[in-house]
Amino acid sequence: VLADPASGLRRGPQTADAPVLASGDHLLRSTWANDHRPDLVVQMGAMPTSKGYRLWLDRVGTDRLVAVDHLGRFPDPAHRVTDRVAAEPGRLAALLVEHLPEVQQTGPWTSTWTGADSVAMSTVAAIATDGPFDEPAVVAALHRTLPAGANLVVASSMPIRDLDAFLPTDERPLRILANRGANGIDGMASTALGVAAGSVEPTVLFTGDLALLHDLGGLLATRRLGLDLTVVLVDNDGGGIFSFLPIAENGHVDHHRLFHTPHGLDLGPVAALAGGRLHEPTGLADLESVLGSVVGNPGLHLVHIVVDATTNVGLHREAAAAVDRALSRALSDDGG
């Protein structure tokens, strides 16, 4: 199971004995994946976040691609789906388990993928924790410090992609929620407050600066509603996701002004404006200490982390390249 972070499958007791893989984006970008072509792919729910998944389908393909969805979506931008099933994915999975013969979870095919995932995630974890204090390190801190059962609301654009690339599996449950779609960055603070209002567990919003700016009005309602919320804000002064586009390397275009769209604002005072407290950690250990002390505490806490979009691009690409090298070495050591 290549688990998108928004599926919720990466965190919980099911990871103890089910083949749930966290490194799908990196695995599918690697040369290793070229030699591991499945006969059948079943895509449950919405189109996954991973661009690596889409590139892999273009590069390697599969005999059958079955899309399972019950919301009338069309999760097939490349028109590769061969079969469509109108069913709620979780319910269909339960019926399959009930009616199909016992599925072998320890066969050679499964073991090959789970072994590759183990190599990939150990490689990725080292980059997140040993590299610069940037978005991958923030994901590592969230993974290690959020209490079991907490709600993690994740903004679109880079936060959900950072989570996809760097969040490992863990038996501790974590409820991950994400707004996806054409207007995915809108209403993030309001969404997080709605989650906080409907849950007794701590709620954390992981967001970028533009997404927060798009819903400052929602954030201002925190004190009036008497809700508790921790906002982990990665601030790269603009739209970091556009630094991943090929046009970012086009010297004839003012990419920074036209695509990154810097706002030039200091977002720290937003905490006081909304009646909350500001925290500005300067490193991974500091961030983990802050999260450990504020998550679940009363009121609004804004954890403001200044990051660099170019650095984050480099870390994502470094992770993909390092996983590719590590898998090649593992195959060589195994005589494969």
Model-derived features: where do they sit?
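Redox- and metal-dependent alpha/beta enzyme cores, enriched for Fe-S-associated oxidoreductases
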Residues: 1-15, 147-150, 162-163, 228, ...
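Glycine-rich, anion-gripping cofactor-binding loops and their flanking helix/strand elements
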Residues: 2-66, 74, 170-201, 214-217, ...
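Short glycine-rich anion-binding loops that position phosphate/pyrophosphate groups of nucleotides
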Residues: 6-7, 45-49, 71, 157-160, ...
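Short acidic-hydrophobic, aromatic-tinged amphipathic segments that line or gate anion-handling sites
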Residues: 18-29, 82-96, 263, 278-285
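Conserved acidic residues
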Residues: 39-40, 82, 150, 300
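Terminal amphipathic helices with adjacent charged low-complexity linkers/tails
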Residues: 64-111
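Active-site diphosphate/adenylate-binding microenvironment
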Residues: 114-200
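Thiamine diphosphate
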Residues: 162, 167-336
